[in-house]
Amino acid sequence: EPVRVAIVGAGYMGRGIAHQFLKPLTGMRLVAVSNRTITEAERAYTDAGLESVKYCETLGQLEETINSGDAAVTEDWANICCSEQVDVVLEATGEVEFAAHVAMKAIEHGKHVVLMNAELDATVGPILKTYADKAGVVITNTDGDEPGVAMNLVRFDKTIGYDPVCAGNINGKIDHYRTPDTQRAFAEKYNQKPIMITSFADGTKLSMETTVLANATGFGVGQTGMFGLECDHVKETLNFFTPEHFANGGIVDYTIGAEPHTGAFVIGYNEDPMNQQYMDYFKMGEGPLYCFYTPYHLPHLQITTTVARAALFGDATATPLGKPTCDVMTKAKRT
């Protein structure tokens, strides 16, 4: 039987995810979309070329529609969380308080929860993880967003016998003083909200994502706000970091302006002389620090691996290890 996925939040990212699930995709099925504006929920289907969509007001209507194989839309997110016809709830609103209610309701009813919502995860992720563990379900951030991409590299490093000591985002640029007005034209070009695009440009989203990554690895930060290394290529992080930077444990950080300008990186440590010789031969440097990176992050595509991982293997892509190791603070841009 295919994994049955329901999406809460049909904004820019929610629609992109729906589009991927509505194309030929082995072993998974998008069964419902919930949004406070029902026309946007319908759009998640119609943008993918599916015109026949059924509006479901009650839980009974929702379950009947899913059972019949039809596309369901609803304004009532709680029905999605309660439905026995849903295996995975994908939260993609970008809200914190509302999304916390969605996650808790889904966990209460035995659903795995996939978060396309770094804001929620950075704020109360460790608390939600505690409830998910008690309920025997998975709550996880997603592959394709930087924390998930970095966690794949962390697991890879550990698998090959390297100790991950630094992980983070590869950023094009950061300007802490960007505003919705400065970002409006760019937002309109890509059919997004100026306030959301501002959060990408001014470092807000970055801070949330690296906090999610820190809580998933147990890492801290090298300094308040992180170092934010400006360099031409992500591999040049090795020109800055030394083993002494990690004497008190691993850290999260980010690059600015470094090729490949997107994706995530992890610095792994290995001091074995023979390994160092081989790594130098294969153009990875002299060691003992080595930079591993993924030159892309494609959340609307890669999220499918997170859904499968959670539903089929009970395994999380990126989830808090325990209590928070990092948090996000805000600063006023003007007084």
Language-model features, listed with the residues they occupy:
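N-terminal glycine-/serine-/threonine-rich beta1-alpha1-beta2 phosphate-ribose binding loop
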Residues: 1-105
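Generic secondary-structure signature for well-ordered alpha-helical cores
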Residues: 22-26, 46, 50, 130-138, ...
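Short gly/pro/ser/thr-enriched loop/turn and capping motifs at secondary-structure boundaries
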Residues: 39-40, 120-125, 129, 146-150, ...
